[in-house]
A protein has these predicted regions:
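A short pocket-lining beta-strand/turn micro-motif at the edge of beta-sheets
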Residues: 94, 133-135
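Structural motif
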Residues: 68-69, 82
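Short, compositionally biased
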Residues: 58-61, 82-104
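SH3/SH3-like beta-barrel fold
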Residues: 86, 107, 139-141
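Residue-level recognition of conserved beta-strand edge/terminus positions
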Residues: 72-73, 87
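Short acidic/polar capping segments at secondary-structure boundaries
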Residues: 76-77, 91
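Low-complexity, intrinsically disordered Gly/Pro/Thr-rich segments
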Residues: 135-152
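Short, positionally conserved secondary-structure boundary motifs
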Residues: 1-66, 77-79, 104-105, 112-132, ...
Length: 170
């Protein structure tokens, strides 16, 4: 068993009051310019460019628990339970569970938003619907338990995986 390591990471707040959030790449770039940091004891080494999200949304307590910090990373790292912090064009970021990525399983079945037309002939190389319209990611937003979000990949600016959940002692 490894010893716990004391690590200092940026701490960002994620709450229902997201009107103050910048959308797109601007928010992602400001994470590491943040002046608010937290020291945590990690059981394992965290990937580079990790940061903590202080989740204040009561609907997320079911998943994260009370007095926790969700640790995300903007590096290419496997997501814990397929949970991501997702940045969208012209909308505030959200935390969600990736249910399906249609761009990864291209050609493995029927498209979600397929519209039959006379041009859908098996031998045809031309489709009346642009391929980019088929590249959707389906998320279950953790702050909206009833909601599923279908998002075109072209509308996603970034997707940071959840790498660790830190429980704060009070």
């Amino acid at each position: 068993m490894k010893n716990k390591q004391l690590i200092t990471i940026p701490l960002v707040s994620l709450s229902n009051d997201q009107k103050r959030w910048e959308s797109g790449r601007e928010w992602e770039e400001k994470i590491f310019d943040n002046k608010n940091y937290i020291k945590i004891l990690a059981l394992r080494e965290l990937p580079n460019f990790s940061y903590g999200i202080e989740v204040k949304d009561p609907s997320m307590v079911t998943y994260f628990g009370r007095n926790t910090i969700a640790i995300f990373s903007n590096s290419d790292f496997p997501a814990q339970d397929n949970i991501f912090l997702v940045g969208l064009k012209s909308k505030p970021p959200f935390i969600g569970k990736l249910l399906k990525n249609e761009s990864e399983i291209e050609g493995e079945g029927r498209k979600t938003f397929m519209t039959p037309t006379p041009l859908h002939i098996p031998e045809s190389k031309t489709s009346p619907i642009a391929d980019s319209l088929h590249h959707n990611l389906i998320f279950k937003a953790l702050s909206q338990p009833q909601g599923t979000r279908f998002i075109q990949q072209s509308n996603i600016c970034w997707r940071h995986p959840l790498v660790f959940i830190h429980t704060q002692e009070k």
